[in-house]
UniProtKB/Swiss-Prot annotation:
It comes from Escherichia coli O127:H6 (strain E2348/69 / EPEC). This is Thymidine phosphorylase. GO terms for biological process: pyrimidine nucleobase metabolic process; thymidine metabolic process. Belongs to the thymidine/pyrimidine-nucleoside phosphorylase family. The gene is deoA. It catalyses: thymidine + phosphate = 2-deoxy-alpha-D-ribose 1-phosphate + thymine. PROSITE patterns: THYMID_PHOSPHORYLASE. Pathway: Pyrimidine metabolism; dTMP biosynthesis via salvage pathway; dTMP from thymine: step 1/2.
Amino acid sequence: MFLAQEIIRKKRDGHALSDEEIRFFINGIRDNTISEGQIAALAMTIFFHDMTMPERVSLTMAMRDSGTVLDWKSLHLNGPIVDKHSTGGVGDVTSLMLGPMVAACGGYIPMISGRGLGHTGGTLDKLESIPGFDIFPDDNRFREIIKDVGVAIIGQTSSLAPADKRFYATRDITATVDSIPLITASILAKKLAEGLDALVMDVKVGSGAFMPTYELSEALAEAIVGVANGAGVRTTALLTDMNQVLASSAGNAVEVREAVQFLTGEYRNPRLFDVTMALCVEMLISSKLAKDDAEARAKLQAVLDNGKAAEVFGRMVAAQKGPTDFVENYAKYLPTAMLTKAVYADTEGFVSEMDTRALGMAVVAMGGGRRQASDTIDYSVGFTDMARLGDQVDGQRPLAVIHAKDENSWQEAAKAVKAAIKLADKAPESTPTVYRRISE
């Protein structure tokens, strides 16, 4: 038996906590026997004193074990359980292609996703722009879809890592969100509750990233890889670029449209293709569905070329109560904005810099995201045909096409786009889409 205040005191004085002490505290968070003040105090001591790797692993596993941990053994699946998690960005629609692509190659992807947070778009919000799409199937249905289709993308239920929800709510109001051990545990508790064999992390870098600097993004990626492997799940991470909008579009319905076009081969943005393929390659290698990069790429290209990946996406949409002919007739089903009009730069030049975060906030301001949890989303608004770094823009080539609900909203968005995109006399040097791979 432990006392919460003694655990806080021990950490306050700079000592490492035992696995038993950490589990006692986390179970107390779940059971409401530990107060908000005590949660805040421990969070602040961790913020200042950090945690050792064994402490980080214990914290993550205790948070994972505070709720249901999915077990797939009874389904006798003939492939690995694998997933990807992204720290979030703008135009980051990779999940919608990646899940079906990896499933078409023999993996099983029980993806538990989130809503939009701040300037970043949420996978669930994007999927809910599809009429009827059910992000909360019951447990039996979720398992059925995984067995039959190979991939399902659903929302987090209250039974998964419940201690994290309470811990995070306290961190949010006590300036302790940006602590690497606490971020790591929060991300991984939910992901590891999926019962995974392998996990790939997409940690964003740049003006639209969650972490403000390359060094902090790198530190987070290294922490996640170390902790997840310590918890028994094969995990690698990629540091990927978020100095510009990843896809050609940013919003909800507009990104779903681009995801379908990507899967069918109608249009594939080169940077989006690079990042999606790189993440899929990691997933296939980590889960032993491919022995090396070349084999993984060949398999992935094949399921794009032969239509299998698009077919899996269509089956997932239908299984989650969306239209059965969505892939063929997406334009008929996705909502369209009242006003669609291009915005042009005031001068000619090359796109040299992009405030990706500001562009994400512009989508939120148009109604495409939430400022508070109770807000309703306008799924039709957003940007398409986004200019990329190095593009030459003039009276013919716009900065973006804005999809808005009315003229006022369009004007505000146009102002935001012009302010977020800087031009120069010559094109900047190109930046990589993937900066670094991190493995154990």
